[in-house]
From Swiss-Prot:
InterPro entries: NAD/GMP_synthase, NAD_synthase, NH(3)-dep_NAD(+)_synth, Rossmann-like_a/b/a_fold
Binding site for ATP: 47-54, 159, 188, 210
Pathway it works in: Cofactor biosynthesis; NAD(+) biosynthesis; NAD(+) from deamido-NAD(+) (ammonia route): step 1/1
Domain of life: Bacteria
Name by which UniProt lists this protein: NH(3)-dependent NAD(+) synthetase
NCBIfam families listed in its UniProt record: nadE, PRK00768.1
Protein source organism: Staphylococcus epidermidis (strain ATCC 35984 / DSM 28319 / BCRC 17069 / CCUG 31568 / BM 3577 / RP62A)
UniProt-listed Enzyme Commission number(s): 6.3.1.5
Lineage of the species this protein comes from: Bacteria, Bacillati, Bacillota, Bacilli, Bacillales
Binding positions for Mg(2+) per the UniProt entry: 53, 164
Record-level GO cellular component terms: cytoplasm
Catalytic activity: deamido-NAD(+) + NH4(+) + ATP = AMP + diphosphate + NAD(+) + H(+)
Length: 275
């Protein structure tokens, strides 16, 4: 294992192997402890896309909330459907919601807000690319979730896991923004393992992962966009040797996207760019 891989593995907290029961209990306890330590929290809010990560996070959140209720805490889990117009895989969102069984579900169509934002920028002389418009979608979705959390005295859950975090494969202040990230410390295959144990429909965790943000490239697979497979990313995070080209790609993503893992830099931040 290279020196950088050792640093990354320690930072990303991925275990070589997990016990499903222990891991689920640990994540539920983390969520419950956070809620208990913040008396204002009445809701946990999460956007549900129909993909592996939001399905797992949502299920664990609802299980934690169920236990909190049994312990006398008044709180609920809010799932949010956030389509941009008509969502191509809307049936998978419904399947995920049926599996999660959330206390409350809202639907907010982000298309009018995103299109208006793009138009306003265009009128100001700023023409967004399709990729940049995709980031607008991600940020609008997170804006909506924070609005709901604010309105219901809640917090927003993130779906960021370590295979996503290492590559920076998320929109800064979009899906990368949240109050807590319960499934950080898992890689992609471990997330699948937990969903299988929890009895999720197979197609929700065996589907090809996609951010599906670009109009010109609908359902673009994550692995195609990243240029590396989740199998290699997962192996890397578990401290295993992987092909050199895959290692170089992962480490390039890690270094280039370091800014996404940090809060805003100040003049006291390291490295000191003002020198």
């Amino acid at each position: 294992m290279s020196r950088l891989q050792d640093v990354v593995v320690n930072e990303m907290k991925v275990k070589k192997q997990i016990d499903s029961v222990e891991e689920i209990q640990e994540i539920k306890q983390f969520i419950k402890a956070y809620v208990k330590s913040h008396s204002f929290i009445q809701t946990l809010v999460l956007g549900i896309s129909g993909g592996q990560d939001s399905t797992l996070t949502g299920k664990l959140a609802q299980l934690a909330v169920n236990e909190l209720k049994e312990e006398g805490r008044n709180c609920k889990f809010i799932a949010v459907k956030l389509p941009y117009g008509v969502q191509q895989d809307a049936h998978e969102v419904e399947d995920a919601l049926e599996f999660i069984n959330p206390d409350t579900t809202y639907t907010v169509n982000i298309k009018p807000a995103v299109d208006q934002s793009v138009q306003s920028l265009s009128e100001a002389g700023i023409k967004l690319t399709d990729f940049q418009k995709g980031n607008e979608k991600a940020r609008e979705r997170m804006k909506v979730q924070f609005s709901i959390a604010s309105n219901t005295q809640g917090i927003v859950l993130g779906t960021d896991h370590s295979a996503e975090n290492i590559t920076g494969f998320y929109t800064k202040y979009g899906d990368g923004a949240a109050d807590i990230a319960p499934i950080f410390g898992l890689n992609k295959r471990q997330g699948k393992q937990l969903l299988a144990y929890l009895g999720a429909p197979k197609h929700l965790y065996e589907k090809v992962p996609t951010a599906d943000l670009e109009d010109d490239k609908p359902q673009l697979p994550d692995e195609e966009a990243l240029g590396v497979s989740y199998h290699d990313i997962d192996d890397y995070l578990e401290g295993k040797e992987i092909p050199g080209t895959a290692r170089e790609t992962i480490e390039k993503h890690y270094v280039r996207n370091a800014h996404k893992r940090e809060l805003a830099y100040t003049r006291y931040s390291w490295p000191k760019y003002n020198k």
